[in-house]
Curated annotation (Swiss-Prot):
Its EC number is 1.5.1.5, 3.5.4.9. Pathway: One-carbon metabolism; tetrahydrofolate interconversion. Catalyzes the oxidation of 5,10-methylenetetrahydrofolate to 5,10-methenyltetrahydrofolate and then the hydrolysis of 5,10-methenyltetrahydrofolate to 10-formyltetrahydrofolate. The lineage of its organism: Bacteria, Pseudomonadati, Acidobacteriota, Terriglobia, Terriglobales. Homodimer. Belongs to the tetrahydrofolate dehydrogenase/cyclohydrolase family. The gene is folD. NADP(+) binds at G165, R166, S167, S190, I231. One of its GO terms (cellular component) is cytosol. It comes from Koribacter versatilis (strain Ellin345). This is Bifunctional protein FolD. Keywords: Amino-acid biosynthesis, Histidine biosynthesis, Hydrolase, Methionine biosynthesis, Multifunctional enzyme, NADP, One-carbon metabolism, Oxidoreductase, Purine biosynthesis.
Length: 307
């Protein structure tokens, strides 16, 4: 029996509708939440992602603006831009699109973003707020994972959760969010002994390692909920066959585009899991939806939640 598909597109649309209603209420009180996106140079993938963010802002009624310094920009000039956005009262959220060019000190730039406008949730102050369960801005993808669980009525309290991957952007924050929700959490990584055995203990398994199809059915407890955070592009025909042999729909898309996306979980995991997020269309759509939610949250937190 195949797993229940947890539809990220549907949940993302629900969240955007809720955000739009919240923005309309704020506008009636004279406040329009504002998001500034900084995109350095012309990275095609980043440009697509930023276009999607701008489109989401238009859908939800959030004011947005783009700043596009050249890829020759210096750290000092980029700092000056970030600091000017920090000072503006009409901007509630600042997002610096990564990666930045090699000559730019990325860490210095991200630390320069005011914590109250850090809608990516990467600033150490927001990380501290998350770890101490205080109101702050939470990284978008982990927050989206929690929304999938909540809106799909997956029990978290008392559940055994295993997070494969310990990145600052996904692995560590989702582990903290699950802990805060009273799950019993194990974080796994490249040095974990007998990874499949550890994963098989999980009622909730989160794969966030950036390795295509690494989590195979033998990693999964029957009936577990699996959140696949990975988005990996495959262009090699032999690798495609490993994951999607016999899948006519994927085959047609691969033949047309010369590539396809696969998560960190092998598609056959869906034959063992009880519920499963597909790639694409699972966790991915939630990232931008939660960015919109974070922008509204920042607008409220900056004003002491009095709006």
């Amino acid at each position: 029996m195949l797993a229940t598909i947890l539809d990220g597109n549907k949940i993302s649309a629900e969240i955007k509708t809720e955000v739009a209603a919240e923005v309309a209420e704020l506008k009636a009180k004279g406040l329009t939440p504002g998001l500034a996106v900084v995109l350095v140079g012309h990275n095609p993938a980043s440009e697509i992602y930023v276009r999607n963010k701008v489109k989401a802002c238009e859908m939800t009624g959030i004011y947005s603006e783009q700043h596009t310094p050249p890829d020759t920009v210096s750290t000092a000039d980029l700092l000056q831009l970030v600091e000017s956005l920090n000072r503006r009262n009409d901007i509630d959220g600042i997002l610096v699109q990564l990666p930045l060019p090699k000559q730019v000190d990325s860490k210095k730039i991200l630390l320069a973003v005011s914590p109250e406008k850090d809608v990516d949730g990467f600033h150490p102050m927001n990380v501290g707020y998350l770890s101490t369960v205080r109101p702050g801005l939470v990284p978008c993808t982990p927050a989206g994972c929690m929304e999938i669980l909540r809106r799909s009525n997956v029990p978290v309290e008392g559940a055994d959760a295993v997070v494969v991957g310990r990145s600052d952007i996904v692995g560590k924050p989702i582990a903290m969010l699950l802990t805060n929700a009273n799950a019993t959490v194990t974080i796994c990584h490249s040095k974990t002994h007998d990874l499949p055995a550890v994963c098989r203990r999980a009622d909730i398994l989160v794969a966030a390692i950036g390795r295509p199809g690494m989590i195979t059915p033998d990693f999964v407890k029957p009936g577990a909920t699996v959140l696949d955070v990975g988005i990996n592009k495959i262009t090699d025909r032999a690798e495609f066959e490993k994951f999607f042999a016999g899948d006519a729909k994927r085959e047609a898309a691969f033949a047309k585009n010369g590539s396809t996306l696969v998560g960190d979980c092998h598609p056959k995991v869906a034959e063992v899991a009880g519920a499963f997020t597909p790639v694409p269309g699972g966790v991915g759509p939630l990232t931008i939806a939660m960015l919109m939610a974070n922008t509204v949250k920042a607008a409220k937190l900056r004003r002491g939640n009095t709006v």
